[in-house]
Amino acid sequence: MQKPVPKKHLGQNFLKDRKIAEKIVENIDLKNKEIIEIGCGTGFLTNFLLERAKFVTCYEIDRNLIPILEKKFKNKNLRIINEDFLLAELEFKEKKTIIANLPYYITSKILFKIFANFEKFDKIILMVQNEVADRIVAKPKTPTYSKLSLASQYIADVKKLFVVGPDSFFPKPKVNSAVVLFDFRENLEAKKMEEFFWFTKKCFQFKRKTLYNNLIFFLNKQQIEKIYNFFQFAQNIRPQQLDLVTYIRLADFYFNNIF
């Protein structure tokens, strides 16, 4: 069988650690579940998914890996799609679970693609750069708290499960990875979500500035004063100091009273 060759421009670091693969699948109930795996790679994790899940659909962008995967998993409950997940039309109706070992350079884009299609998923387990995992689960008043923290925690209850060292991959990445679980919230509304994402992105446009100096780029002084008076904010408050609930209220206030 042809040996898979990692491609640097695709950010490929193939998982090779059996204990890590087992740990990932043990953190979620896969029985009778239909799974989407983004990036099969060598099919190492796919093997463990197929042992437990009802069906696995894999999006793999690297066409050189397709014949290897097809031969390895012949007659298995697996569908392999040679396509960039970012360009894929997600036409299924039944909710699915996503499991993926994501290239570091494209993590945020894939996350926001998933978020935009939140009604199609119930859970996500992602292997990401440890630094990104810290941003996803970050709390207010911490250095890693960001619009990604807010977006992730708006969509789901998020939990950093465990850290994975470079030795678990081929080739070895230069930094640690981490596995993060997203358990999607119920009763999410697409319009409210889009408004929240748009508003929080504006608030974190210039992270070192005060909230006021971020808002001034799209609001006038009277509108900002209306917000500050209603929420009783201190003049020097910064975007990192406000929690998720406050941002939800802020976005609602903006779209209902100012926009």
UniProtKB/Swiss-Prot annotation:
A Pfam family hit: RrnaAD
Principal place of residence: cytoplasm
Catalytically driven reaction(s): adenosine(1518)/adenosine(1519) in 16S rRNA + 4 S-adenosyl-L-methionine = N(6)-dimethyladenosine(1518)/N(6)-dimethyladenosine(1519) in 16S rRNA + 4 S-adenosyl-L-homocysteine + 4 H(+)
Gene Ontology CC: one annotated term: cytosol
EC numbers for this chain: 2.1.1.182
Keywords of this entry: Cytoplasm, Methyltransferase, RNA-binding, rRNA processing, S-adenosyl-L-methionine, Transferase
Subcellular location: Cytoplasm
Keyword set includes RNA-binding: yes
Annotated residues for binding of S-adenosyl-L-methionine: 13, 15, 39, 60, 84, 101
GO molecular function (one): 16S rRNA (adenine(1518)-N(6)/adenine(1519)-N(6))-dimethyltransferase activity
HAMAP family for the chain: 16SrRNA_methyltr_A
Family in the record: Belongs to the class I-like SAM-binding methyltransferase superfamily. rRNA adenine N(6)-methyltransferase family. RsmA subfamily.
Entries under NCBIfam families matching the protein: ksgA
Functional description taken from the UniProt entry: Specifically dimethylates two adjacent adenosines (A1518 and A1519) in the loop of a conserved hairpin near the 3'-end of 16S rRNA in the 30S particle. May play a critical role in biogenesis of 30S subunits.
Protein name as annotated: Ribosomal RNA small subunit methyltransferase A
Organism, scientific name: Mesomycoplasma hyopneumoniae (strain 7448) (Mycoplasma hyopneumoniae)
High-level lineage: Bacteria, Bacillati, Mycoplasmatota, Mycoplasmoidales, Metamycoplasmataceae
